[in-house]
UniProtKB/Swiss-Prot annotation:
Described purpose of this protein according to its UniProt entry: Envelope protein that may play a role in host-cell attachment and viral genome entry.
Coiled coil (UniProt feature): none
Top-level lineage group: Viruses
Organism: Halorubrum pleomorphic virus 1
Keywords linked to the UniProt accession: Membrane, Virion
Protein name per UniProt: Matrix protein
Length: 132
C-alpha cells in the first residue's frame, strides 16, 4: 500500500485499515491464550473481583471467529482449498471440544505444555485461513 503525504493523506490511509478484523484478532488470541492456559488468571476488580473462566474465553473465541469469518471477503467455502476447509473447521472444533468433550480435553492436557500450545497454534492458524 502506498502511503500518502500530509495530514489529510495520512488520515485517509488510516481509514483504509480494517480495524474490526484487527480488533477481533486481538480478542481471539487473548481468549485462546486464556482458554489453553497461556494466561493463568483474569480477574475484573470492578465487578467485585469476578474471575473469568475458560467458558468466557471459549465464548469470546467462538464469537470473534464467527464475526471475523462472516466479515471475511472469502467467506464462501467454495473459495477455499480442501486443506483450508479442514483448518477452518478444526479451529472451532478444538475450541468447543476442549471445553465440552472430555476426551479432547484429556488429549490436549498432556503432562507437558505441548498439548495446549499445539491446540492454540491450530486455532490461530485456522483463524488466519478463515479471515484471509
Amino acid at each position: 500500500m502506498a502511503y500518502s503525504k500530509g495530514v489529510s493523506g495520512t488520515l485517509s490511509d488510516y481509514t483504509h485499515l480494517r480495524t474490526l478484523p484487527a480488533l477481533l484478532s486481538v480478542v481471539f488470541v487473548i481468549a485462546g491464550l486464556y482458554q489453553f492456559g497461556g494466561i493463568s488468571d483474569v480477574t475484573i476488580t470492578w465487578l467485585s473481583n469476578y474471575t473469568l473462566t475458560s467458558t468466557h474465553a471459549m465464548g469470546a473465541s467462538i464469537g470473534a471467529y464467527a464475526l471475523a469469518f462472516a466479515s471475511s471477503e472469502t467467506k464462501q467455502f467454495d473459495n477455499y482449498q480442501d486443506f483450508e476447509k479442514v483448518l477452518i473447521a478444526a479451529g472451532p472444533a478444538v475450541i468447543l471440544g476442549y471445553e465440552y468433550i472430555q476426551p479432547v480435553t484429556d488429549l490436549i492436557n498432556t503432562t507437558s505444555n505441548a498439548g495446549p500450545i499445539a491446540a492454540f497454534v491450530v486455532t490461530v492458524v485456522a483463524w488466519g485461513v478463515a479471515v484471509r
